[in-house]
Regions:
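Negatively charged, low-complexity tracts enriched in Asp/Glu with abundant Ser/Thr
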Residues: 1-27
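Residue-identity detector for threonine
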Residues: 7, 43-46, 76, 80
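Extended hydrophobic/Leu-rich segments
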Residues: 8-12, 16, 35, 64-68, ...
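Amphipathic, interaction-prone secondary-structure segments
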Residues: 18-49
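Mixed-charge, Lys/Arg-enriched low-complexity segments
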Residues: 56-96
Length: 96
């Protein structure tokens, strides 16, 4: 049984679960947001630059998606991406 898509957050998860990922765009309070499907995070030890790790949506997608959704990147920093997407209807986001 498919989950009913009621909010933009529901649509985000629907897009994220699709094997062919796209960037997700939405507008909110005068800002355009782009959540990149090809985002990467690199880490390494600061003292010796060893033990480099690469995290990308292909292998660590759920973990990175949750970090993105929990970030506060709007100008007033009063809402997380998750909170914003929860307020918007599904048709407010588009793929690119």
């Amino acid at each position: 049984m498919e989950m009913e898509v009621k909010t933009a957050l529901d649509k985000f998860y629907e897009v994220f679960d699709n094997p062919k990922k796209d960037d997700v765009f939405f507008d909110y309070e005068g800002l355009r947001y782009q959540l990149s499907c090809c985002g990467y995070i690199f880490t390494e030890r600061t003292e010796d630059c060893e033990d480099e790790q690469e995290y990308g949506f292909d292998e660590h997608g759920k973990e990175l998606a949750e970090a993105v959704l929990n970030s506060k990147v709007n100008q007033t920093r009063d809402k997380t991406i998750r909170e914003i997407l929860s307020e918007l209807p599904p048709e407010a986001i588009w793929l690119g």
